[in-house]
Every structure is written in structure tokens, then in C-alpha cells.
């Protein structure tokens, strides 16, 4: 059976995530005790408070530490992916699973990424909304109308995540995003809901973060990819010769094509998805996109269900 690992992004995190794995599995505990991130991943993850964990510069290393730990637990059980993908931040966990990044490397790297993303948005009032019940092209068209209205102001609202059919996020400056919500509702969107993130991620406002990542990547070693990773900004695996560093630099400031990524993995023969991370957001996206099962691994008790699905 061909298995695809899917790694969660920001938004579903909660204080206490991973504590049951920490108590039950030494390989998971090792990740939380010995990582070299500048932030205290263990304390923030297990004790919070929410305000601390919700800060992007803290959320990112905590989420990736959780993902790395669970990946190691699954490997110990003999469960390894044939392909991997991740939503936004989750792409870094997917690259860890594929052998491109080491555990020692990836957690400090995403702490740097989180900080760079926060700094890119500093001084701007930003917002992200989830647009429910609207097609891709209509959302793009609505954002184009808003861009014309706000031309010359420097304010933007751009499609950020194409999560699954009927759910797309729009991100940017708060004023422009509020206007986009009005325009998209007038055009037939069922709802526009606020999303819990602290910056205009996956829009052109993140270019300064992309620039910082490019500089950081120059001093990073990228390992050989052991399994295919399906990239957010491509909606498919990379071609030979395409640089992972360039793709990741672009990823932070480009739309995420998660729906296309899921379809691509199924086309490549994936018969079971495993969602790694808090919550079950990606499982819902899979359910709405393809007819392939997805088992979430958020708590130790989820492992039984996964073993059953594989056997």
C-alpha cells in the first residue's frame, strides 16, 4: 500500500499537543528535550500560555518538533511514507521526512522562518479569511477587483491557500481583506471566516521573508530527497534540476495549491494518507478533494486506528 504523509500547518495548534507522545515514547521525548531552537519548545508547547504558542515565531518550531517526533515514532513502528507533502509550514516537516533536512537543522530553521515572516509584516495591520463555497477562478477574479480598487494605496488582498474545493484563504492588509470579503460575498461566497494567523502569509507582502530565507539557505546543507515531496507552490513534485531552496523561498510569498497536491499524490498511486499534526484539518481537505482515506495522528490513541488501516 502506497502511503502519503501530510503535515499540518499553523492554525490547529493547542497547548498540550504532543504531551502524551512525550510521556510514552523516548524518541519523541528526545526531540523535545534536545532540539536547538532559540525558543523553549517544550515549555511553550506543553504549558503555553495560548498567547505565547500563538506567536508565529513560537508556533512554527513547536509544530515541526511535534511532526518530527511523531514521524520518528511511526518509523519505529515500521510505518514510513512513500510520498510526503505539508501545508505551508508543514512542507518543512515533509522535507525532514524525505531526508532533505535533519532533525537538528529543521527546528531552528523554521524558528528563523517564523521570525522572518513576523518581521515582514511588522507595522502592517494584516488579516486572513477563509472563503467558503466559491470556485478558484471566482476568488481570483474578486481579488483582482479589489486590487484595482486599491491600486496606488500599497494595500493588498491575495489568494493565499487553495485548500480544497470550496475553501480558499485570502490574505493581506486588513482593510483590503475586509473589502475582499464584501466583494466575494456579493459574488456568491457563502461565508468569509477569520483565520487564526498573525500575518499575510503566502502573499507578495512576504517577499522580505523570502529574501531572508534565501540568505539563510546559502549556509544550509540540503540532503538528497529519499522520497518525492509534493510542493505547495507547484501542486506537484519538483522537476530534476529545480532547487528546493528556491522553491521554499518562493513558497512563503506564493499561493499554496494544496488541493492540486492531494490530487497529484493520488494520481501517483497514494492509497492512504496519514495526517501528522494537531487537529484534523488536512483530513477534511482530503475528504473534500479525493476518495482516499486519511487517518489523523494527533494523539497516541490514534496509532491503533492507523495500524488497523495499514493491515
Task: Describe the residue ranges of each PLM region.
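FabD-like malonyl-/acyl-CoA
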Residues: 1-144, 272-301
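Alpha/beta catalytic cores of group-transfer enzymes, especially the acyltransferase/condensing modules
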Residues: 11-12, 36-39, 98-253
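Short glycine-rich catalytic loops that host catalytic nucleophiles or stabilize transition states
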Residues: 195-197, 266, 298
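A short, acidic, amphipathic alpha-helical segment used as a generic capping/interface helix at domain edges
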Residues: 254-270
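Short, charged, surface-exposed secondary-structure boundary motifs
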Residues: 302-310
Amino acid at each position: 500500500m502506497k502511503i502519503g504523509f501530510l503535515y499540518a500547518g499553523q492554525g490547529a495548534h493547542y497547548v498540550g499537543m504532543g504531551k502524551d507522545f512525550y510521556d510514552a515514547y523516548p524518541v519523541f521525548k528526545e526531540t523535545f528535550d534536545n532540539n536547538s531552537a532559540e525558543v523553549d519548545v517544550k515549555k511553550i508547547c506543553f504549558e503555553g500560555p495560548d498567547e505565547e504558542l500563538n506567536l508565529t515565531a513560537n508556533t512554527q518550531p513547536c509544530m515541526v518538533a511535534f511532526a518530527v517526533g511523531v514521524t520518528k515514532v511511526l518509523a519505529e513502528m515500521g510505518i514510513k511514507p512513500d510520498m510526503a507533502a505539508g501545508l505551508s509550514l508543514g512542507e518543512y516537516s515533509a522535507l525532514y521526512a524525505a531526508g532533505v533536512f535533519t532533525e537538528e537543522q529543521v527546528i531552528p530553521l523554521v524558528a528563523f522562518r517564523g521570525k522572518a515572516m513576523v518581521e515582514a509584516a511588522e507595522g502592517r495591520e494584516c488579516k486572513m479569511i477563509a472563503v467558503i463555497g466559491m470556485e478558484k477562478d471566482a476568488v481570483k477574479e474578486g481579488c483582482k477587483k479589489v486590487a484595482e480598487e486599491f491600486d496606488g494605496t500599497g494595500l493588498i488582498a491575495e489568494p493565499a491557500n487553495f485548500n480544497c474545493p470550496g475553501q480558499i484563504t485570502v490574505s493581506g492588509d486588513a482593510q483590503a481583506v475586509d473589502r475582499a470579503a464584501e466583494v466575494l460575498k456579493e459574488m456568491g461566497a457563502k461565508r468569509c471566516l477569520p483565520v487564526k494567523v498573525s500575518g499575510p502569509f503566502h502573499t507578495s507582502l512576504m517577499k522580505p521573508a523570502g529574501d531572508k530565507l534565501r540568505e539563510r539557505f546559502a549556509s544550509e546543507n540540503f540532503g538528497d530527497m529519499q522520497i518525492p515531496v509534493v510542493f505547495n507552490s507547484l501542486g506537484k513534485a519538483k522537476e530534476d534540476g529545480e532547487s528546493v531552496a528556491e522553491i521554499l523561498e518562493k513558497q512563503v510569498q506564493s499561493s499554496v495549491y494544496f488541493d492540486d497536491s492531494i490530487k497529484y499524490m493520488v494520481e501517483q498511486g497514494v492509497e492512504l494518507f496519514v495526517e501528522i499534526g494537531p487537529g484534523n484539518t488536512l483530513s477534511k481537505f482530503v475528504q473534500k478533494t479525493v476518495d482516499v482515506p486519511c487517518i489523523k495522528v494527533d494523539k497516541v490513541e490514534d496509532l491503533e486506528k492507523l495500524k488497523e488501516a495499514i493491515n
